Amino acid sequence: MVALLCSASLCGDISVGDACLVSNIKAKCRDNLVTGGLKFHALKIGSRKKHWRRKSMRCSVVSMKSSDFSGSMIRKSSKPDLSSSEEVTRGLKSFPDTDSSFSYFKSVAGNLNLVHTTETCNYMLEALRVDGKLEEMAYVFDLMQKRIIKRDTNTYLTIFKSLSVKGGLKQAPYALRKMREFGFVLNAYSYNGLIHLLLKSRFCTEAMEVYRRMILEGFRPSLQTYSSLMVGLGKRRDIDSVMGLLKEMETLGLKPNVYTFTICIRVLGRAGKINEAYEILKRMDDEGCGPDVVTYTVLIDALCTARKLDCAKEVFEKMKTGRHKPDRVTYITLLDRFSDNRDLDSVKQFWSEMEKDGHVPDVVTFTILVDALCKAGNFGEAFDTLDVMRDQGILPNLHTYNTLICGLLRVHRLDDALELFGNMESLGVKPTAYTYIVFIDYYGKSGDSVSALETFEKMKTKGIAPNIVACNASLYSLAKAGRDREAKQIFYGLKDIGLVPDSVTYNMMMKCYSKVGEIDEAIKLLSEMMENGCEPDVIVVNSLINTLYKADRVDEAWKMFMRMKEMKLKPTVVTYNTLLAGLGKNGKIQEAIELFEGMVQKGCPPNTITFNTLFDCLCKNDEVTLALKMLFKMMDMGCVPDVFTYNTIIFGLVKNGQVKEAMCFFHQMKKLVYPDFVTLCTLLPGVVKASLIEDAYKIITNFLYNCADQPANLFWEDLIGSILAEAGIDNAVSFSERLVANGICRDGDSILVPIIRYSCKHNNVSGARTLFEKFTKDLGVQPKLPTYNLLIGGLLEADMIEIAQDVFLQVKSTGCIPDVATYNFLLDAYGKSGKIDELFELYKEMSTHECEANTITHNIVISGLVKAGNVDDALDLYYDLMSDRDFSPTACTYGPLIDGLSKSGRLYEAKQLFEGMLDYGCRPNCAIYNILINGFGKAGEADAACALFKRMVKEGVRPDLKTYSVLVDCLCMVGRVDEGLHYFKELKESGLNPDVVCYNLIINGLGKSHRLEEALVLFNEMKTSRGITPDLYTYNSLILNLGIAGMVEEAGKIYNEIQRAGLEPNVFTFNALIRGYSLSGKPEHAYAVYQTMVTGGFSPNTGTYEQLPNRA
């Protein structure tokens, strides 16, 4: 092969024609022209005429093989070409095979005027990797080390790929072992560089492993490497490792500098180890490495973070009097940190000092001042500060306005924040995604997911592309509200706007799925998260384990726990606490103890919550003795029991019947932890149940004596409620009487309320009335209106209307003014019992006593009128109320009216009223649709009923069991059994469980249509698959339809099954059997059934005689 070698530095005379003549030698070969290290194809010389005319060149023709490149063949240049890297790369790419490229690579390496770069070396490494040439790759890597060519991430990743090491840079510690085996031996510079690359990628653990290997191989890391490692470990709060590195560097003869010491102070300070930070500061002085202004600023920052504000001020004063004067960063740090601690006075003091020292306030410092004023609640001064800024020629920037908006939202001044937000553009500042995020976050945390989503959409319409933080903030609000549909739209729309979900995104979506019960979707998302290279954090997995346990998917929860190792996650104390709680809930004591012991062995020390969870498991499963043993172990392990610990063990002792032991434990508890309200509610019910009234009395009096304030009424209500639930009415009343009689409870009414409630709930309304009289008359308790209402409600529930009226009169006679709830109780009772006159009389009384009726009152009256058959009167009242603008109808207003009209055959009016609901801001609910569907169904208008069903689904109203039952019934009534069966299947597929009524309707419909095999299949399904016990209607329906179809033997079997089920047949049962036998031409069987019926004490009706053969 012939190549033309030219050098611009070697001047000679050559014409373009001569050059072209020379270039034609062996034109069929691949000729190369190298000019000052730049390569051109010989056939392209003509295109560079202008360049060649400017320069005279000396050239020589050299005959050689394509692989025979040597350094001597490339003429020396007096001046290296700065663009050589790009040209060398082009040269490497021009060769048809890797061997030629590698030869050219080595020849360039031998030329002193040409310099290989990271780009050329990486290209060569990749080309060699593709051909599997590891030895040559090792040569390239060694050259990079010797020539000190930067080894970047791509360098190492290419080598890792060639060695089949998967997992990226994170696998560096493992890859280094393989690299050495294949000749890639790192020097000190490479080790330092690799550690920096790992730290830059936040692989701190892996960086430390590489550091350890570096030390083992006898290399000494640089001071910069130690500093970088310390910074990385400091971010992870790994103080021991940071301080360990400080010692190690000294053993290797490296002397820490001011930067290294400052890093240590920052790490110690942020971890709250202020004394240790001061020791480092003292050591700096002792070793002649005096702290600089950065060191002092870092120390001030640490002291402020640890809330040691006085110490921070002392350091500041020391700086002022010393040689290291505070700089602008020092003042910004002081202003910012004291602002965070809401110390406005100090902020103003530092501001004054800053100005005295000649540091002119700028937009950054002014923004900090605005933040401090907002945190102090001085919003007027904060807004005035904006004017001061403008007067000084400093325009508030976006961060200033965002700070002010955040301050306003922090104190829930939403309207002011929105006003400022609306004025930003007129003030010359355009809101960014962050501004919108602030509002989205506020709405989300306030539970207003609608406004959060509207703000997110508004941001997009303004042309601001949402970032991942905005999406995550929106997802937070939607997840909190369980609005999975909108959350999915945002999540799956991320790709459309060029965003990639991060760990927070996935966490929010999994939370949302968990909230709506879509656990499988959450698990799928976890897999997707890992596939997309987004590593799940332990919080996400803990949440998922907890969700699975709550859904009783215990096995899957444990599988998720086992997968944590595969996900390279270390279980935390929260993980173990969740699993322990689950085991305790399922009564698996042994497994809980084993898990507890396992977590200790695996280096995850239990905390107080862990022990409390374990105690809860043991005490609920009658293992209180073991819990007491574990309590001693808890204290030995340095865990301090809290009030929850003692409450749990007291619960266990009381549950186990060890009331006296519980009392002793309670007295021991007081020496360490003061009991709380829960303690009393746990202990006293057991003490009272054991009839230890005197002991219970002493415990409560002692507790109240040590209380600073008298307990609220709710305290007594909850306490007596707990005692009633455990000890029963008699002992609870004895204890309560003692408390009231001795004035321990100053407001006896708060004790009377739970007693009345308990008695009424247990259907002992007369007893409630008696106790009410005893406490009010004998013990002098003055009942309040809520107590009267409770008693009146209980009496009316038990249909004791007259006594309730007496109590109502008593209310008025004692000076208590009945409220709307009192009247509503009585009005509802009158309406349900058909006492319309009394209802209207009381309704009028309300207005004369200035007790304003509410919507519930009006609804009760309307409902009462409808039930009494006075639909028109009810409509008149409705229209009168609608003329009053203060009345807002509800679904309970329309329900009785639509029902009354439907049952009266006035379906057109019912539909008209239904259509008018939305005009008054009342959206029809499922119950309203059910009433109307039932009305049309009963009238035989199945199409209208089906249309209403489709409409309710379209409008987002979820049908319930009643809806499907009504629809199935009306379709079967008109013979459209297939459609009825369709909706019955849809009912089951929707997750609803059909009841016996629904099964009866479809079985009867199939039977009437002579589809008896299908009817029997559903009959068996309800018994076996669904566990629903058929009632007499089910059996009667089957007997009747089987008999009509001539299947009298099967009908007889169903009759026998009635007897086995323990049900008593009625006249309709016998009539159905008689009819079946009569139609089948078996009169003797028909008369036999008739005889059985009469001898069984059943009275035949006209239907019986009509079915007997002699009447045929």
Swiss-Prot record:
Keywords: Chloroplast, Plastid, Repeat, Transit peptide. One of its GO terms (biological process) is RNA stabilization. PROSITE patterns: PPR. SUPFAM superfamilies: HCP-like. It is found in: Plastid, Chloroplast. One of its GO terms (cellular component) is chloroplast. InterPro entries: Pentatricopeptide_rpt (IPR002885), PROP1-like_PPR_dom (IPR033443), TPR-like_helical_dom_sf (IPR011990). PPR repeats lie at residues 117-151, 152-186, 187-221, 222-256, 257-291, 292-326, 327-361, 362-396, 397-431, 432-466, 467-501, 502-536, 537-571, 572-606, 607-641, 642-672, 676-711, 712-746, 748-783, 784-818, 819-853, 854-889, 890-924, 925-959, 960-994, 995-1030, 1031-1065, 1066-1100. Pfam families: PPR, PPR_1, PPR_2, PPR_3, PPR_long. Gene3D superfamilies: Tetratricopeptide repeat domain (1.25.40.10). Residues 1-62 form a transit peptide. GO terms for molecular function: mRNA binding. Belongs to the PPR family. P subfamily. Plays a role in the stabilization of the primary polycistronic transcript of the petL operon encoding subunits of the cytochrome b6-f complex. PANTHER family: PENTATRICOPEPTIDE REPEAT-CONTAINING PROTEIN 4, MITOCHONDRIAL-RELATED, RESPIRATORY COMPLEX I CHAPERONE (CIA84), PUTATIVE (AFU_ORTHOLOGUE AFUA_2G06020)-RELATED. This is Pentatricopeptide repeat-containing protein At4g31850, chloroplastic. The gene is PGR3.
